């Protein structure tokens, strides 16, 4: 199912959506933060999807617990370190970990740039102990408005040498991409690549805007592109990568069932598309789960899954020499 001669990558993976249950428990107790349960076992349903839950509101509540326990910069560093460990232990050869420093900082009023530094330090420490290649993507969380995104951008750009790209995430309907055109001009001027959450809650116009105005060369989720034949043609022609997260899309009610997921439609249209976990801590999944789902629920053959693996490497924010090195390590 997973082809061991091809690098296994996860390109759409939120660091702040992957906090271990026991880490939430330990940090909560360490910092005197009231948790919604009185044991580790009973905490899990409050912070992870259980069974067939499919509600965006429930999903976001669980996600909020992951940052509620980030009471100091050591906690941030720990979570970043554990993200590297989790990526390696799940069998990944390469992962791009994205994070929103504003979202991580806000509960306990941590310094935004300090959060960025703590994430970088935690990842560096993790890379000393685990065999996996990691790059970082900064997120601007549009839900908090333009001014907050400016603060976030400045904290991230102060350490741009440790980032490969910038992302726009959050409330796509309430805060459309055009509000952030100036922010992304600064990102382009800084020489960083751009990906954007688009076409998830909003329609295809949001994706056109992200590509044509923000400068995105990859799109997170993008499920609504399938209703716009011109966009599908454009995506295929220009190799705009779709970072697909099927289980997360089900958990957030972006799609009502795996049968409704447009992954196959993208593949049949020749669009570059990869499989990713999104918020693996909340969804309680790993990358291998997504490949199993792609085979059993989305109907992909082993040959198609191998192509999806290759797509991920092609889409990655890597130099050609880094791409070749990933393949060489699998030979």
From Swiss-Prot:
Q: Which keywords, in A-to-Z order, does the entry hold?
A: Hydrolase, Metal-binding, Nucleotide metabolism, Zinc
GO cellular component: a single term: cytosol
A single Gene Ontology MF term assigned here is: adenosine deaminase activity
- Residue positions binding substrate: 14, 16, 170, 279
**Entry note: cofactor:** Binds 1 zinc ion per subunit.
Where is the site labelled Important for catalytic activity?
221
Keyword Metal-binding (UniProt): yes
Q: Which organism is it from?
A: Shewanella sp. (strain ANA-3)
Which positions in this protein are listed as binding Zn(2+)? 12, 14, 197, 278
Q: Which family does it belong to?
A: Belongs to the metallo-dependent hydrolases superfamily. Adenosine and AMP deaminases family. Adenosine deaminase subfamily.
The entry's protein name is Adenosine deaminase
Which principal EC class is assigned to this enzyme? hydrolase
């Amino acid at each position: 199912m997973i082809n061991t001669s091809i690098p296994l990558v996860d390109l759409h993976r939120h660091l702040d959506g992957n906090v271990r249950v026991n880490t939430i428990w330990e940090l909560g107790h360490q910092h005197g933060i009231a948790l919604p349960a009185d044991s580790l076992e009973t905490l899990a349903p409050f912070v992870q999807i259980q069974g067939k839950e499919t509600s965006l509101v429930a999903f976001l509540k669980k996600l909020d617990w992951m940052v509620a326990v980030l009471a100091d910069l050591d906690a941030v560093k720990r979570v970043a370190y554990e993200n590297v460990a989790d990526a390696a232990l799940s069998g990944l050869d390469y992962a791009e970990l994205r994070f929103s420093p504003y979202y991580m900082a806000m509960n306990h009023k941590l310094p935004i740039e300090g959060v960025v530094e703590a994430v970088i330090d935690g990842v560096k420490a993790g890379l000393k102990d685990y065999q996996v290649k990691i790059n970082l993507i900064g997120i601007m969380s549009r839900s908090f408005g333009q001014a907050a995104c400016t603060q976030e951008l400045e904290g991230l750009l102060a350490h741009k040498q440790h980032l490969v790209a910038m992302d726009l995430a959050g409330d796509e309907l309430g805060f459309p991409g055009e509000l952030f055109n100036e922010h992304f001009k600064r990102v382009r001027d800084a020489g960083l690549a751009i990906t954007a959450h688009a076409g998830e809650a909003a329609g295809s116009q949001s994706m056109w805007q992200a590509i044509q105005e923000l400068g995105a060369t990859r799109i997170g989720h993008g499920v609504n592109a399938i209703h716009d034949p011109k966009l599908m043609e454009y995506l295929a022609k220009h190799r705009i990568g779709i970072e697909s997260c099927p289980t997360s899309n089900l958990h957030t009610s972006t799609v009502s069932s795996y049968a409704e997921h447009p992954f196959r439609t993208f593949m049949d249209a020749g669009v570059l598309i990869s499989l990713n976990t999104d918020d693996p801590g909340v969804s309680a999944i790993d990358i291998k789960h997504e490949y199993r789902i792609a085979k059993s629920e989305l109907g992909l053959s082993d040959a198609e899954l191998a192509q999806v693996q290759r797509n991920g490497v092609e889409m990655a924010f890597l130099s050609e020499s880094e791409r070749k090195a990933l393949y060489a390590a699998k030979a």
